[in-house]
Amino acid sequence: MPAPIHAKVVIIGSGPAGYTAAIYAARAMLEPILIQGIQPGGQLTITTDVENYPGFADVIQGPWLMEQMEKQAAHVGTKIVTDLVTKLETAQRPFRLTCDSGEVYLAETVILATGAQARWLGLASEEKFKGFGVSACATCDGFFYRNKEVIVVGGGNTAVEEALFLTNFASKVTVVHRRDHFRAERILQDRLFKNPKIKVIWDSAIDEIAGEDKPAKVTRVRLKNVKTGALTEMPADGVFIAIGHAPATELVAGQVKLKHSGYVETAPNSTATSVPGLFAAGDVADEVYRQAVTAAGLGCMAALEAERFLSLRASERAAAE
């Protein structure tokens, strides 16, 4: 078995948060190691058109943007590793990371940038049209549905907020919910029910999403009444799935403090977690905004905080000698 690899900073995850953290850590001469994980590039690799990332006047492709971030991180000195961290031990110093390949890393600090995954319906037709009419982010993709008819699936705060946001663009928004009442906050429900652009279909679920192949686009959905089993079809230009997100916190479960929602809890105005030296950036800690640009900002914060943590530790060791 090879000897463990020592590092000042190990970054877990390769979305905007991870790569930005790597860029800043490398420029601080911390020689960071970034372990990409199971989906190099994060959620942007399944996003077709990106129109809201600063610096690009024209529409860019999500995978292309992540390629540029990876190249920049490597260019400034990040060691990028294609592997998956399967175990993170924070009770010891330095932290111990074990990878799927068997490689072991010993890190003085760790930046957790594992992200969060949107929960999907699990339909084959949903998978077929992801990025071509099926989305899990109204803020990202709502602009493309000006004067079109869209469907929002869900009944919590996220679904209601997405529906309200989409009324800025769509001509009609239909909320499909499998129950006969919303779980969303009352003030959000009041806004939704007062909006003339929004219609609600209760006790129903998406049974199938249909459309065209060349070019790929959604044209209609089939709904199933969960009480009667009755099937109906309705036209739709887009379907927004808003049934929640699942933060990728498996590595730190039981080791760091999590919010009730399951996201990593960080100190106010910080990326510091309840474990000194462990920082969380991006969607694994951000349950509110979940945008590429905010994830990048948190990655920057995490790297700067890791640098300060290491400097403080070095000063303390020097003073003790």
What are these regions (language model features)?
Residues P2-V76, K148, V160-R186, F193, ...:
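Beta1-alpha1 glycine-rich phosphate/pyrophosphate-binding loop at the start
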Residues G13, Q36, T114, G154, ...:
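Short beta-strand/turn micro-motifs composed of small residues
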Residues G15-P16, Q39, A116-A118, N157-T158, ...:
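Residue-level detector of alpha-helix initiation sites
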Residues I80-F143:
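Glycine/small-residue-rich loop that forms an oxyanion/phosphate-binding "nest" at active or ligand-binding sites
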